[in-house]
C-alpha cells in the first residue's frame, strides 16, 4: 500500500508539472531579435535553429588568409553565404572552385559537400544562412 501511495503521488506531481507548463507551441514560437556580428575568428553561430527560429540557422565566419572552414555538408538544408569582406572561393565536390569577392552571395544546394577558403590577402568575413529545403528531389 505504501508503494502504491508513492506511485500515485509521483503521477499526480507529474500531472501538475505538465498542467503548469506552457503549451509546446507557445514555448517554441520564435521571437524577433537583433544580433551583433562580433567574431574574433572561425565560425561564430548566431541563430541556432529551433526554438530560436522555425528551423533556420545562421552564423558569422571570419577566416584569415589561407584558412578554410573545412569540408562539410548541410544535409537536406540549403545554404547561402553573404560575403561581407575579402576574397575567397567556394569549393564544391565534383565541380570547379567558384571564386568570389565582397560583396557577393554564394548559394549551395542541399546535400552538396563543400568548403570555403580565404584566397585573398586580407580577412574574409561572411554570414551563412542554413535553412530547411522544402523542394528536395
Go through each PLM region and give its residues.
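Bacterial N-terminal signal peptides
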Residues: 7-18
Amino acid at each position: 500500500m505504501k508503494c502504491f501511495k508513492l506511485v500515485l503521488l509521483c503521477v499526480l506531481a507529474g500531472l501538475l508539472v505538465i498542467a503548469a507548463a506552457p503549451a509546446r507551441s507557445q514555448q517554441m514560437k520564435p521571437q524577433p531579435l537583433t544580433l551583433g556580428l562580433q567574431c574574433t575568428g572561425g565560425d561564430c553561430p548566431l541563430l541556432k535553429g529551433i526554438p530560436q527560429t522555425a528551423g533556420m540557422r545562421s552564423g558569422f565566419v571570419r577566416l584569415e588568409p589561407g584558412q578554410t572552414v573545412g569540408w562539410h555538408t548541410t544535409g537536406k538544408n540549403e545554404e547561402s553565404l553573404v560575403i561581407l569582406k575579402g576574397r575567397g572561393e567556394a569549393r564544391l565536390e565534383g565541380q570547379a572552385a567558384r571564386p568570389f569577392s565582397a560583396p557577393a552571395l554564394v548559394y549551395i544546394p542541399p546535400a552538396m559537400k563543400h568548403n570555403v577558403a580565404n584566397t585573398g590577402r586580407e580577412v574574409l568575413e561572411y554570414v551563412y544562412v542554413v535553412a530547411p529545403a522544402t523542394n528536395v528531389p
